[in-house]
Amino acid sequence: MEKFSTHCGVGAPLKQSNVDTDQIIPAVYLKRITKTGFDDALFAGWRRDPEFVLNRPEYEGASVLVAGSDFGTGSSREHAVWALRDYGFRVVISSRFADIFRGNSGKQGLLAAQVEQSDVELLWKLMEEQPGVELEVDLESRTVACGGVGVPFQIDDYTRWRLMEGLDDIGLTLQHEEDIEAYEGARPSFKPTTLPARS
């Protein structure tokens, strides 16, 4: 997972509340277990509408999604985060996230930045006044800047640290590789051990 400190990218206003994981990626696309190849499935039910925000040319290449409240509710599918990342999003901004979605996001390198609802509406206004405007998201200072306006966002310290260090669950485990090898080296040979890492 790559380290995250700041990100600057085109913002897309998703003016919908209660966007659940089935709307983010319908269940029919969940047959694969790889983390890639889901970009076409993102918001599949809505992308048939030519007026849907991600179909509009001014939001092409958007990497910051600003959504309504209660984003990521529903089933706890990691595929929702995979689809957002595979499409190119690095940040989702909302006034409230489902707990499991927020947890999955941090583990997959997607920043779920929680702001006040009034700030969501301000960002929507700025993006609609200047379609294609870039938002700068600074994880270190926990701020989002757009068109000369800055708003603070909330994120727990642990998830912030993991994102800034670029540590997914495997990366966290590998930080203790020497301890794991020492423990396994001291275990009796008849007990199971992990296989050596492949290069």
Curated annotation (Swiss-Prot):
Database matches in Gene3D superfamilies: Aconitase, domain 4
Residues forming coiled coils: none
Catalytic activity: (2R,3S)-3-isopropylmalate = (2S)-2-isopropylmalate
Keyword hit for Lyase: yes
One protein family per Pfam: Aconitase_C
Gene Ontology MF terms: 3-isopropylmalate dehydratase activity
Pathway: Amino-acid biosynthesis; L-leucine biosynthesis; L-leucine from 3-methyl-2-oxobutanoate: step 2/4
Keywords: Amino-acid biosynthesis, Branched-chain amino acid biosynthesis, Leucine biosynthesis, Lyase
GO cellular component: 3-isopropylmalate dehydratase complex
GO term, biological process aspect, one: L-leucine biosynthetic process
EC number(s) stated in the UniProt entry for this protein: 4.2.1.33
Complexes and interactors: Heterodimer of LeuC and LeuD.
Alphabetized HAMAP family for the sequence: LeuD_type1 (MF_01031)
NCBIfam families on file: leuD, PRK01641.1
The family this protein is said to belong to: Belongs to the LeuD family. LeuD type 1 subfamily.
Reported function: Catalyzes the isomerization between 2-isopropylmalate and 3-isopropylmalate, via the formation of 2-isopropylmaleate.
Full protein name: 3-isopropylmalate dehydratase small subunit
Organism in which the protein naturally occurs: Kocuria rhizophila (strain ATCC 9341 / DSM 348 / NBRC 103217 / DC2201)
